[in-house]
Amino acid sequence: MLSLDNYSYVHNITTQTNIDLSSQQTIHLASINGKGYIIFLRFFCEGSSACFTNVKFSVKANGLVLYSFRYIQLLELGQAIATAIPSSSQGFSTLLSNYNVLISSPIGTLPQLTLYDSYDNRYGAMLQPAFPLPFVNTLSLDVDILPVSQSSYDPIPYSLNDNQISTNAPTGKGNISIEYLLYNCLV
C-alpha cells in the first residue's frame, strides 16, 4: 500500500444528530481545492439496529457516487473483525459498540474487505484498493443517507448475508458521525 507519511491531509469529524432515517438526507463533509485525493471514511452509527437496518449510504465525490453500502454491512464488518482481532487489541470494544468502519475505494472498482490498522492505531475495516482520485480544482465530498426502498442509486455491490436483510423500511431517528481523512497525493 502507498505510504502516506509525507503527504498533506485534512482530518475532521462531521456529526448529524436526530436524523430521520425514513427519508433521504445528505451530509456534506468537505469542499477542498486540489486534486489527487485519497479518501478514508469511518462511520459511527448510534440508534437501534432496527431503525438503521435498511438505510443505505452513498459516498459521493463531485456528485459522482463512489460506492454504496447498507448499514447492515457495517455491522457484518464489525462481526468479521471481531473474529479476527484478539479482544486485547486496542480499539476492539469501540469497534464492536459503534461498528466503526474505515473505507476507501477508487472510482470504477468494486471494493473488497481487508482488515486494516488505521492511521490512529485503532482497528477498522478498509475497502481496498486505495489510490489517488483524479479530481481537478475542487473536491466536494458528500454522503447520501436514504432508505433502501428508494432505488435511484446504483445497486449495493455485495452483502455478506443477503438473506438476513430485513425488507422493512427504516423508521425512527439516529445519530451519525463520519470521520474523514483526505490525503492530497499531488502536492
UniProtKB/Swiss-Prot annotation:
It comes from Sulfolobus polyhedral virus 1. Disulfide bonds join 45-51. It is found in: Virion. Keywords: Capsid protein, Disulfide bond, Virion. One of its GO terms (cellular component) is icosahedral viral capsid. VP10 self-assembles, together with capsid protein VP4, to form an icosahedral caspid of 87 nm in diameter, with a T=43 symmetry and composed of 420 hexamers and 12 pentamers. VP4 proteins arrange into hexons, while VP10 proteins form the pentameric densities located at the 5-fold axes in the virion. The stoichiometry of VP4:VP10 is 42:1. The keyword Disulfide bond applies. This is Capsid protein VP10. It comes from the Viruses.
